[in-house]
Design a protein with these regions (language model features):
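Intrinsically disordered, low-complexity prosegments and terminal tails associated
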Residues: 2, 33-40, 129-138
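Non-cytosolic head/periplasmic domains of membrane-anchored proteins
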Residues: 89-138
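Membrane-interface motif at the C-terminal end of an N-terminal transmembrane signal
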Residues: 14-35
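Mature extracytoplasmic domains of secretory-pathway proteins
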Residues: 39-97
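Intrinsically disordered, low-complexity regions enriched in Ser/Pro/Gly/Gln/His and often acidic
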Residues: 11, 40, 76, 105-109
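Short hydrophobic helices that act as membrane-entry/anchoring signals
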Residues: 2-6, 31, 42-46
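N-terminal Sec-pathway targeting helices
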Residues: 1-16
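Short linear interaction motif-like sites in intrinsically disordered regions of transcription factors
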Residues: 2, 48, 114-117
Length: 138
């Protein structure tokens, strides 16, 4: 019984150390890109695939969010929601004339990228949309 508990403690310690080391690296990148400790827990959730992304800045017609480093995730998300996705280089345009937002534009920031996360811009011709609103679309 003691060996099992010891093994569980060792595995838990290794996992916790792995998450802490990666969190420190993520925080370093966040600081480099102008963000801080407030964004760290949500960014770690994005890295661990618990979250699809979260808003970090807004403008009149666009939402800037930290999302997953693999942009294909958002392409698949659009397709599951019934959008037709065209990819032009790094930018994606999702269209569906039957939806509230007929076209949604995703653009990853080429300069703000690392293994753990990427900064994206999302906007629509039919009004402002945030990543949270997009996730809730049917």
């Amino acid at each position: 019984m003691k060996k099992v508990i010891k093994l569980i403690v060792v595995i838990f310690t290794i996992l916790l150390g792995y998450i802490c080391v990666n969190s420190a690296i993520i925080y370093n990148y966040l600081r480099e890109y102008g963000y801080g400790i407030n964004e760290l827990p949500k960014t770690v959730a994005v890295w661990m695939r618990v979250s699809a992304g979260f808003t970090v800045a807004e403008s009149d017609n666009a939402d800037f969010f930290i999302g997953r480093s693999y942009s294909g995730y958002y392409k698949k998300m659009c397709e599951k929601k019934g959008y037709y996705v065209e990819q032009m280089g790094r930018d994606m345009i999702a269209t569906n004339s039957q939806k509230r937002y007929e076209s949604i534009y995703f653009s990853p920031d080429i300069d703000v990228w690392c293994h753990w996360f990427r900064l994206y811009e999302i906007c629509s011709n039919d009004g402002k949309i945030t990543i949270d609103e997009f996730r809730k679309l049917e």
